[in-house]
Curated annotation (Swiss-Prot):
Compositionally biased spans, kind Polar residues: 1-10, 174-185, 498-509
Listed name of the protein: La-related protein 6B
Low complexity bias locations: 23-49, 465-478, 510-519
Keyword RNA-binding: yes
Keywords noted in UniProt: Nucleus, RNA-binding, Transcription, Transcription regulation
Bias-annotated ranges (Basic and acidic residues): 154-173
Residue ranges annotated for the RRM domain, each copy included: 285-383
Comp. bias regions, Pro residues: 61-76
Locations listed in the record: Nucleus
Length: 545
């Protein structure tokens, strides 16, 4: 080993000059060979740049890429065959999901299935159109051979599809026509609309509606047979929205089993007549409930009021607008009575017997929560308590008045404003004559002013309330200063006509102011000319300002 290391160390390493001489000799040899083979010039230049790099030898040979298949243009179709093109859709057909492209697929324009056979005809019009690869495009050629021979079958199939769609649409129309309600030949209305109208008018003539409203009862009481003019029923909002004229409504109501239409078609009445005694008996079993809960549907109200006993009917009424057509006298009396122009949702509940209604008033009324608690009262009690206080009014007229008030508070759609104003004004004109005037006063002018005040306000109602009004009837009282007793007796004569006893003794008149203690609570309204009313049962002291 020592000898070998000595020999290796004694052998001089190759110097740089030897490498250069070797490369020069190699390059000279290469140049000689390159001059003979010109294709080796490129490899010679690369060998100069990196002479020390090993030569790259590929491990396998890459086969040449196959050329794409050539498209064979078929011959044009014969002259006797008409070639039809499909219209281009307004938008390109979207591609839902990726479609793998295989080498045998040909990109074809999406609007025509045989576009590759006729691309030379109109390729200039669709240069910017989107091309979608179509799978199994050769299926058309396999079925029909040449693309032009398949067109008649496609056209016939398209026509068959159109005919089928037309038949389906026609069948749908027939089905819809068959499902619709048939039209009545007499009235010209659908049968379902006729039944709705009949049910609505029967409800208007029902016992509960007649007992809680007075609009139809006034017409029933006026007619000896209990007829109501057909135009009155046709004026209701729900009927007016469906009916065109009165004769059409008369024809519709002939289908009712509870109503009878006159021969001329101008009047309608109940088949089973209703009497005043039946109305009073029904009203005694009805309670009026106010301050209802927020969710006052029929089911919830039935749960509340059925805890007392069996409930037959419940009728919920919306609040009445304050600006209805009643005169100021009727509105002020309504506030004192508590039955007119309710500004809250209220309900009429009909029980089986009177005892259940009285029990409901006792158990369901929330007296502790007077602001928002449930308020329950008897309907008939409010109608009969005021004649017991000696107001000098007949029972029949008072019942009609209270029923009229309930009608205003509940069913505003059944009470025209003009009729309501006329009836209220007529009733309050009658009440004006009932105001007892004839107190022993030294100032006849004040007595005449009280008379004018009572006529304008309509608030007397037999209470004997003294009032002040020094801006009315000044000339009338000045000319009648010498006829005090005669004027007083004249007014007592009017009281005798409406059912009260005449009073000629001034001492009897002095006892009447004591009745002011029974008037309903709450402030009285101002007269609008001098200020607020004073006294409330005390002797009036006229003060000069």
């Amino acid at each position: 080993m020592a000898d070998q290391q000595t020999l290796d160390s004694s052998t001089p390493p190759p110097t740089q000059s030897d490498d250069l001489s070797h490369s020069h000799s190699t390059s000279s040899t290469t140049s000689a060979s390159s001059s003979s083979d010109p294709s080796l010039l490129r490899s010679l230049s690369l060998s100069r740049l990196n002479a020390g790099a090993p030569e790259f030898v590929p491990g396998r040979t890459t086969p040449p890429l196959p050329q794409p298949p050539r498209m064979i243009i078929p011959p044009p179709p014969p002259h006797g065959m008409l070639h039809m093109y499909h219209h281009q859709p307004p938008f390109n057909t979207p591609v839902l999901g990726p479609v793998p492209i295989q080498p045998h697929l040909v990109p074809v324009q999406n609007h025509h299935p045989h576009h590759r056979f006729h691309q030379h005809h109109h390729h200039n019009r669709h240069q910017n159109q989107q091309y979608v690869p179509v799978r199994n495009h050769g299926e058309y050629q396999q079925r029909g051979g040449v693309g032009g021979e398949q067109e008649p079958d496609l056209v016939s199939k398209k026509n068959d599809r159109r005919d089928h769609s037309k038949r389906e649409s026609k069948n749908d129309q027939v089905t819809e026509t068959g499902a619709s309600v048939s039209i009545d030949s007499k009235t010209g209305l659908p049968e379902d609309s006729i039944q709705k109208i009949v049910n609505q008018v029967e409800y208007y003539f029902s016992d509960l509606n007649l007992a809680t409203t007075d609009h139809l009862m006034r017409f029933i009481c006026k007619d000896p047979e209990g007829y109501v003019p057909i135009h009155v029923v046709a004026s209701f909002k729900k009927i007016k929205a469906v009916i065109n004229n009165n004769s059409q409504l008369a024809a519709v109501l002939q289908n009712s089993a509870k109503l009878f239409v006159s021969e001329d078609g101008k009047k309608v009445r109940r088949i089973s007549p209703i009497t005043e005694s039946a109305i009073e008996e029904l009203q005694s079993r009805i309670i009026v409930a106010e301050n209802l809960p927020e969710d006052h549907c029929y089911q919830n109200l039935m749960k509340i009021f059925s805890t007392v006993g069996s409930v037959k009917n419940i009728r919920t009424c919306q609040p009445q607008n304050n600006g209805s057509g009643a005169p100021p006298a009727a509105r002020s009396a309504a506030k004192s009575d508590g039955t007119l122009f309710s500004n809250k949702v209220h309900a009429f509940v009909e029980y089986e017997i009177v005892e259940l209604a009285e029990r409901a008033v006792t158990e369901l009324s929330e007296a502790g929560n007077w602001r928002s608690g449930l308020k329950v009262r008897l309907m008939l009690k409010h109608q009969t308590k005021e004649p017991k206080q000696g107001q000098g009014r007949g029972r029949k007229g008072h019942d009609a008045d209270v029923e009229h008030e309930e009608d205003d508070a509940t069913t505003s759609e059944q009470q025209p404003i003009e009729k309501q104003s006329d009836d209220c004004s007529g009733e309050w004109d009658t009440h004006m004559q009932e105001q007892p005037i004839g107190e022993d006063q030294g100032n006849e002018k004040a007595a005449g002013q009280r008379k004018g005040r009572n006529r304008g306000r309509g608030k007397g109602r037999g209470r004997g309330q003294p009032h002040q009004n020094q801006n009315q009837n000044n000339n009338h009282s000045h000319n009648q200063n010498h006829n005090h007793n005669g004027r007083g007796n004249h007014h007592h004569h009017h009281h005798h006509q409406v059912g009260t006893q005449p009073s000629n003794n001034p001492m009897n008149n002095m006892e009447q102011p004591g009745m002011g203690k029974q008037q309903p609570p709450g402030p009285r309204m101002p007269d609008g000319t001098r200020g607020f009313s004073m006294g409330r049962g005390k002797p009036v002291m006229v003060q000069a300002e």
